[in-house]
């Protein structure tokens, strides 16, 4: 049985990815940062072929502990999905150094070093999928630091795809648009805000978590064997 690690898999997009990969026959390592109950629920839905592991990717030492736990769970990691991340919505003038450091620690540094430390487990022909965002290709002054982190990950993906290409390991980004998640519920529950958000997509609606999971499942599949170093835009035609 193939094994996948999905970070930030307790809720939202990560949860949907974990459930979809399990449906596709993967044993799933469900990473979570703090919500143990949510991660346990995902494991319960998957059954015996899932295990939950906790780590705060922004805390020194936690990435190493996570990588060690993954190595204890499996000798081979067929798919790594770097989904965990935190969002920010502040313009330049209102940003603080502490908040800036935190979002880069989780979204960039944690992702970078987790990938580095589990890479020895990834076999030739393996898959790495990084979840970025549609804001990496537009001007997003409302959340400039967050957008910068997603741009950094996309550059990381390019370099890693070239480095790992000779081993047949593909590395790709999946960039969601505005998705109906519990994190976004606070503002998407406002009808006016929801209509505005939907209008920013060519499809004139908000995306679903399962739609992003479907794209990730493709990127993680044998059918995507000749796709690497690219960003798959899953924004529903956002900001065209």
Regions found by a protein language model. Give the residues of each.
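Short C-terminal tail/terminal secondary-structure segment
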Residues: 138, 217, 228-240
